[in-house]
Amino acid sequence: GDPDSKNAKKGQMLGQGGPDYTIAAEFKQELIHRKGALAAARMADQVNPRKESSGSQFYIAQGKVYTKDELNNLAARMGKQFNQTQIEAYTTVGGVPFLDYEYTVFGQVIEGLEVIDKIAAVQKDHYDRPTEDIKMTIKVVEQ
């Protein structure tokens, strides 16, 4: 999601590029960080208490599959409760439940979830950037 990543040199640190504007946070109960969720990156709460999203940077949620006990323990630590949609998603396809309603989710990978794991498994440099560029093509499908 960093616009500076296009044609970036090998080893160049990325993750700080983008426009000077942010987008208001938008949380919807049905849009959660299940595996494959497309979500907007943002600055930390300390400098961004309204949780406004980056104007261009995004990420794809990977996470893990949780047991019900793990979800219950996580919910207790967070002081929250997970709804049935979250429980179903995180105990089957997995994801990143602690990011729900903290970062705006705006889309979902609908085919090729296994590619997320392949991308996450490649060799990375000290900036956590793949040592070989991985080009993505994104197609918007409206429902």
Where in the sequence are the language-model features?
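Cyclophilin-like peptidyl-prolyl cis-trans isomerases
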Residues: G1-Q143
